[in-house]
Amino acid sequence: MRFTIIIPTCNNEATIRQLLISIESKEHYRILCIDGGSTDQTIPMIERLQRELKHISLIQLQNASIATCINKGLMDIKMTDPHDSDAFMVIKPTSIVLPGKLDRLTAAFKNNDNIDMVIGQRAYNYHGEWKLKSADEFIKDNRIVTLTEQPDLLSMMSFDGKLFSAKFAELQCDETLANTYNHAILVKAMQKATDIHLVSQMIVGDNDIDTHATSNDEDFNRYITEIMKIRQRVMEMLLLPEQRLLYSDMVDRILFNNSLKYYMNEHPAVTHTTIQLVKDYIMSMQHSDYVSQNMFDIINTVEFIGENWDREIYELWRQTLIQVGINRPTYKKFLIQLKGRKFAHRTKSMLKR
């Protein structure tokens, strides 16, 4: 078996060496490092490792996004001799392959001609110990499934821990998206796959530090707009209600609400721009399936973290909620009730300690 590992890099000097030396397999493999324009020591590090280790190739691009780098790697697979790659992986430069685990994927892939994808578990670094990511807990044993049979796969919108048939190199990441560029390509691959082999082993560990894409107003606006765009696109791709609910749950709860919490903790003063953006998101949810609890969690995030409400901004918020069937009192009554709710919440939190 022959397979290719694509690693998109850009200023990853802190982690790239650890990843490259962690890759080992009994199969014939090659590593394509596609750099998007690093200005640190990433490229010199890769070049030094090329002299120490076999299989590493480096392609340098300028001002290229992660999606562009991955697409370059996929194009390379398509353009080379078909016998050079039976399969491929894409691994983040902040990840590491856990010892002896890569061949768990390759063994499963070789075991059955109908296997088009092999998916293992992902881990995160918790105080020096690898812990299973909660989104991967549904992989409890080794088994063969399809997306229809296992819609939980839609909670795993990451390349890490996945081995793809080389025929999926024809697919492309969305270069117009900075953060969710891989959602559509992953869904298409899952839908096209004849069979998907699940491996109940932690394959890849993630050393990434969560820097958040929502640290300032401009980034937050761009990020939320992107989430709305990809959410609508993928929801239109999914035919079964259960699939749409699982995907929307992941996007609404993890991507949107978690980012909203982070942003509002950094910028608690409620502004017209923030409320308008949340309104746009809530209204976009109405055009597709969603978990109702996620709607209430988003509302709680805005009301519990938000500060410095004024009458005009509150009225915009109140009318938004009325449009989706949720009543809110007048401005003064809202402030009184909110103060009471926050006090009760703090008291409950103190009693739990």
Curated annotation (Swiss-Prot):
This protein's UniProt keywords: Cell shape, Cell wall biogenesis/degradation, Glycosyltransferase, Teichoic acid biosynthesis, Transferase
Signal peptide coordinates: none
Gene Ontology MF term list: glycosyltransferase activity
Pfam family, one: Glycos_transf_2
Source organism, top-level taxon: Bacteria
One record GO biological process: cell wall organization
EC number: 2.4.-.-
EC main group: transferase
Family designation: Belongs to the glycosyltransferase 2 family.
PANTHER family per UniProt: GLYCOSYLTRANSFERASE, GLYCOSYLTRANSFERASE TAGX-RELATED
Name of the protein described by the UniProt record: Putative glycosyltransferase TagX
